[in-house]
């Protein structure tokens, strides 16, 4: 499967996604549970130990036929913590049996080593692991107060994934509990265990992140972090800097709106999950404005729905090109969280700001 890159190191990255697939093929994210066994300070979805789950029978009956119909070749299983879904193994196998690639985003606390060994026989499966520091005092605290046993288990499980060549990326949110040198160590660790990249996301104003912005790195620390980790990048290892300060005044990277759809546990399909998360905050937007339909209630044609969505919804092309010649729309979700118009500039990373 050829990757369609969203992240471009020559641009100021606006989008939280690193890559998708080339059309007419599609990639989606499937929220198979709202439950999570942790309580992270920055969780977009505000997940906890209660919530709904997507059943194996619903996926088989409603979701899978529409994935095939819409040429979906890659599914990211997410949550909550997707491994909290008791049918995670069967769901994964169902997708693999229909030649749909699977990526699992996990906190790595619930990994079953025997299952990982079995999955290593497949070529189209990998894991992305969240890791926000190298110490109990950083990662453990940021992730809701982990026990020493759980903290050690996370690293053991990362090593297991690396051993079986199933570790694709490490996802990290720079935060005040961890030092810059700690993130240098994290990148070196990821490279040593066989990850292809470390993706650094800022602590964004969605979900619990609204209330924990004081934990975010300052712009100066973000710049220093980037400077100290750039040397770790190599031909087979990438550090992905999402929405870092644009001190180089680079043009804003593209927005792949509609190229990675998100299916919530209740079957709702979002044109972008972050727009829905942002609209759940204290602003003038309605989360329903960014829902295209429901896969449990209708037989959706994604191409048709996307065309209708762009035509009938609140998007327009009023961006002031005469003053923003080196800019693009940037991230809609960030603008929603800031209470801006969708046609406004993404001022956080605009090269002219």
Where does each model-flagged region fall?
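Conserved alpha-helical substructure of the radical SAM core
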Residues: 2-126
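Flexible mid-to-C-terminal extensions adjoining Fe-S/redox cofactors in radical SAM and related proteins
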Residues: 2-19, 276-353
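Residue-level signal for mature regions of secreted extracellular proteins and peptides
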Residues: 29, 33-36, 248, 265, ...
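Cys/His-rich metal-chelating microdomains
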Residues: 35, 39, 46, 258, ...
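Flexible, active-site-proximal loop/turn residues at the rims of small-molecule/cofactor binding pockets
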Residues: 49, 81, 110, 133, ...
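Hydrophobic pocket-lining residues within nucleotide cofactor-binding pockets
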Residues: 82, 109-111, 174, 203, ...
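Radical SAM enzyme [4Fe-4S]-AdoMet core and its adjacent flexible, acidic
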Residues: 128-132, 137-260, 265-270, 274-293
């Amino acid at each position: 499967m050829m990757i369609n890159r969203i992240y471009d190191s020559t641009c100021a990255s606006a989008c939280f996604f690193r890559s998708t697939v080339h059309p007419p093929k599609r990639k989606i994210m499937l929220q198979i549970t709202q439950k999570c066994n942790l309580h992270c300070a920055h969780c977009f979805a505000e997940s906890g130990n209660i919530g709904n789950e997507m059943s194996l029978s619903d996926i088989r009956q409603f979701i899978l036929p529409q994935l095939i119909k819409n040429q979906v070749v890659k599914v990211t299983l997410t949550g909550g913590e997707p491994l909290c879904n008791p049918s995670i193994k069967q769901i994964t196998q169902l997708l693999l049996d229909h030649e749909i690639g699977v990526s699992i985003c996990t906190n790595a606390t619930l990994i079953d080593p025997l299952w990982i060994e079995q999955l290593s026989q497949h070529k189209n499966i990998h894991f992305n692991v969240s890791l926000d520091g190298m110490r109990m005092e950083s990662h453990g605290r940021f992730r809701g107060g982990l026990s020493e046993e759980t903290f050690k288990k996370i690293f053991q499980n990362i090593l297991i994934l690396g051993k079986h060549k199933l570790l694709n990326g490490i996802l990290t949110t720079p935060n005040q509990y961890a030092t810059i040198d700690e993130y240098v160590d994290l990148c070196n660790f990821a490279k040593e265990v066989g990850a292809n990249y470390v993706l650094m996301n800022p602590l964004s104003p969605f979900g619990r992140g609204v209330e924990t912005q004081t934990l975010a790195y300052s712009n100066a620390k973000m710049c220093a972090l980037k400077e100290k980790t750039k040397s770790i990048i190599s031909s087979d290892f990438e550090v992905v800097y999402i929405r870092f300060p644009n001190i180089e005044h680079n043009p804003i990277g593209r927005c792949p709106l509609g190229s990675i759809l998100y299916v919530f546990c209740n079957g709702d399909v979002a044109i972008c999950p972050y727009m829905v998360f942002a609209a759940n905050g204290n602003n003038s937007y309605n989360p329903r404005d960014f829902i295209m339909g429901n896969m449990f209630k209708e037989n959706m044609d994604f191409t048709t729905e996307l065309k209708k969505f762009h035509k009938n919804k609140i998007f327009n092309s009023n961006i002031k090109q005469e003053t923003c010649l080196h800019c693009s729309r940037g991230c809609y979700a960030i603008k929603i969280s800031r209470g801006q118009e969708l046609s406004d500039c993404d001022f956080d990373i605009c090269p002219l700001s």
